[in-house]
Amino acid sequence: MAVTAETSMPGANSNDRQSAAANDAGGMPAPRRTRASAEAARYGVLRRLAPALKHDMVVNLQAISMMAEVLNAKLERGSPAPVEFHASIAKLNRLAREAVANCLKVASWIEPGEDEGVRLAEGVDDCLSLLASNFNFRGFVVIKDVPESPFQVSRVVLRHLLVASLITLTDAAQGPCEVHVKAEVVTGMAEISVRISPRQDGFEGLPFEANYRELEWQDVQALAQAESVELIRGTDNITMRMPRAIATAPLQIAPV
């Protein structure tokens, strides 16, 4: 189901100034520079998510391999009872279906299909779940304030901007922090804010070195400008305002 925005919000004023500066520089045209910056930011987000995406894709495949080895060992010892054999095959089929679903989910981060709407709370959880292991390792505690709401936003836009904001703020942190994530509907727009504050319990996170470059404020700006999302930056927080996602194509029923 493809979606479009109900309204279009301009990017931050700083983005407009950046576009003007690009034209004045006499180099790449501003629209092309904006697209290139957004693509670089998207690539940076995916590279930083790569370990988590790889884990999500491999975990079910490993389970299938282990189950197949167990079943093979039983067959080598002699034919198992029909009931036991059928139960093992059923479990193997279930694991295979879960593996396919997980692989398709990972692929949707790399190459999204038709954009679709997602409920705000579900979309936020989708992003936080991928960063959970990384944040735990580094000593970041997520405090979430995201009430359930039928309000939907673009899944692709939310993924890129929220993950970029979370990584940008935690990359800039001087140590373990509390990461406050709040999402609500304000005057017909989804307002998502991310704020960090130092932990007060003296916890020391493990040394961490990013698998790819650190993300910066310019990356978040480029993504927001490309998607026409309003963006506000504070000293230790980022707030974004996203329009409602509206379906523009009929639902497609997948063949069984």
Q: Which stretches of residues belong to each language-model region?
A:
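Glycine-rich ATP-binding loops of the HATPase_c
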Residues: 225-240
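Conserved short alpha-helical segment within the C-terminal cytosolic histidine kinase catalytic core
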Residues: 125-141, 164-171, 219
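Conserved ATP-binding N-box helix of the HATPase_c
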Residues: 47-70, 152-181, 213-227
